[in-house]
C-alpha cells in the first residue's frame, strides 16, 4: 500500500527521474480552473489593448506607446509563461533547452514590465511638472527609442543573470525532468536593485512630485482661479486630463508594486532563491496575475478603451476607414 501512495515518476524508465506533485483532486481542479480563466483573461484583454492602440490613429500618442509596450509584455506573459508554469507540476517534459528559454522569458518580461513602469512615471512627471516642454521633449521618436532600449537592457540583464543556465541548461537539476534555476545571494541582490529597488526609488521620487503638483492644480481648479485667455483655459483643461491620466497610471504602478513585493521579499530573505520550482508558486503567480490586472484598470478608467472594445467585438474595426474613428 505504501508503494502505491508514492508519487509516480515523471519518466518511469529513468531511475533519476523527478516525481510528480500530488494534490487532492478537488484542489487541483479548482486551481486549474481559476488559473486557466486568469490566463485566458490576460491574453484576451492585453490583445484588445494591443489592437486598440495599434489600429486607432487617435491613440498613437507617446503615453499610449508605453502602454502598448507594457501590453505586449503582459500578452506574452499570458500566452507563453503562465500556461507553462501552470502545466509544470514537478515534471518538465519539454527538454532542458526549453526550460532555459522559459526561465529567460520570465526574467525578460518581468524586467520589461518594470522598465515600462519607470518610463510611464517619467512621462507623467514631465507632463504634469513641466507641461510647457512636454510636446518638445517627449516625442514619438524618443519614446520609441526608450522602449527599444528598455527591451534591450532587459534582454542583456536576463542573459547576464542566466549566463550559467544558458551554457549548461541542466546544471541546477536535482533530478531528471526538473526545471529550476538557483539565484545566489549576490545575483539576487543585483537583480533586486536593478529590477525593483532602483525602479521603485525612481518611481517614488517622480510620483511624489507629481502628487504635489496635482494637488495644487486641483485646489486651483476648485478655487475658480480666473482664466484670462482662451489659451490658458485650454491649458487648464489639458492639465486636468493629464492629472487624470497620472492618477490612472499611478494606480497601475501601485498594483504592480503590490504584486511584486512578495516575490522580492522572498528573494531578500533567502540566501539563495529557487526559480521555477513547483513549490515557488504563490509569489510568482502574484507577479504573473498583475499582467491581467493592467487592462482591467484601463476598462474602469479609460473611456477610449471601452469604446475600442465595442468596435473590436462588433467587428466594426474591419470597416474601411475605421482607424480614423473618434474614440476619445
Language model features with spans:
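Intracellular effector-coupling site of seven-transmembrane GPCRs
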Residues: 212-259, 263
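Loop architecture of class A 7-transmembrane GPCRs
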Residues: 10-22, 91-103, 108, 130, ...
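Helix-to-loop junction signature of class
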Residues: 35, 39, 52, 76-91, ...
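Seventh transmembrane helix
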Residues: 202-203, 255-268, 282-328
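Cytoplasm-facing ends of alpha-helical transmembrane segments in multi-pass membrane proteins
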Residues: 43-54, 71, 75-82, 108-132, ...
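Alpha-helical transmembrane segments of multi-pass membrane proteins
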Residues: 39, 69-78, 146-158, 195-200, ...
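Extracellular N-terminal segment of 7TM GPCRs
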Residues: 1-44
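Extracellular TM2-ECL1-early TM3 structural module of rhodopsin-like
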Residues: 24-36, 62-122, 127-137
Amino acid at each position: 500500500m505504501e508503494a502505491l501512495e508514492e508519487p509516480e515518476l515523471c519518466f518511469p524508465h529513468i531511475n533519476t527521474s523527478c516525481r510528480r506533485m500530488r494534490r487532492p483532486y478537488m484542489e487541483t481542479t479548482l486551481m486549474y480552473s481559476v488559473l486557466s480563466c486568469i490566463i485566458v483573461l490576460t491574453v484576451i484583454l492585453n490583445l484588445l489593448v494591443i489592437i486598440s492602440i495599434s489600429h486607432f490613429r487617435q491613440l498613437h500618442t507617446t503615453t499610449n506607446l508605453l502602454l502598448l509596450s507594457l501590453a505586449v509584455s503582459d500578452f506574452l506573459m499570458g500566452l507563453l509563461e503562465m500556461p507553462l508554469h501552470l502545466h509544470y507540476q514537478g515534471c518538465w517534459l519539454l527538454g532542458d533547452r526549453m526550460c532555459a528559454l522559459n526561465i529567460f522569458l520570465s526574467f525578460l518580461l518581468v524586467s520589461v514590465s518594470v522598465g515600462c513602469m519607470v518610463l510611464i512615471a517619467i512621462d507623467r512627471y514631465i507632463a504634469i511638472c513641466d507641461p510647457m516642454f512636454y510636446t518638445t521633449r517627449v516625442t514619438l521618436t524618443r519614446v520609441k527609442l526608450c522602449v527599444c532600449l528598455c527591451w534591450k537592457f532587459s534582454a542583456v540583464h536576463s542573459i547576464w543573470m542566466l549566463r550559467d543556465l544558458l551554457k549548461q541548461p541542466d546544471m541546477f537539476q536535482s533530478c531528471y525532468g526538473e526545471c529550476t534555476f538557483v539565484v545566489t545571494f549576490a545575483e539576487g541582490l543585483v537583480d533586486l536593485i536593478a529590477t525593483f529597488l532602483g525602479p521603485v526609488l525612481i518611481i517614488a521620487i517622480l510620483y511624489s512630485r507629481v502628487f504635489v503638483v496635482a494637488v495644487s492644480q486641483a485646489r486651483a481648479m476648485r478655487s475658480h482661479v480666473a482664466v484670462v485667455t482662451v489659451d490658458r483655459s485650454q491649458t487648464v483643461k489639458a492639465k486636468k486630463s493629464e492629472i487624470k491620466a497620472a492618477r490612472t497610471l499611478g494606480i497601475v504602478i501601485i498594483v504592480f508594486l503590490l504584486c511584486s513585493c512578495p516575490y522580492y521579499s522572498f528573494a531578500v530573505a533567502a540566501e539563495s532563491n529557487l526559480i521555477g520550482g513547483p513549490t515557488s508558486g504563490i509569489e510568482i503567480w502574484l507577479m504573473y496575475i498583475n499582467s491581467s490586472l493592467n487592462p482591467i484598470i484601463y476598462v474602469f478608467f479609460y473611456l477610449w478603451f471601452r469604446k475600442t472594445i465595442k468596435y473590436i467585438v462588433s467587428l466594426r474595426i474591419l470597416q474601411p476607414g475605421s482607424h480614423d474613428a473618434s474614440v476619445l
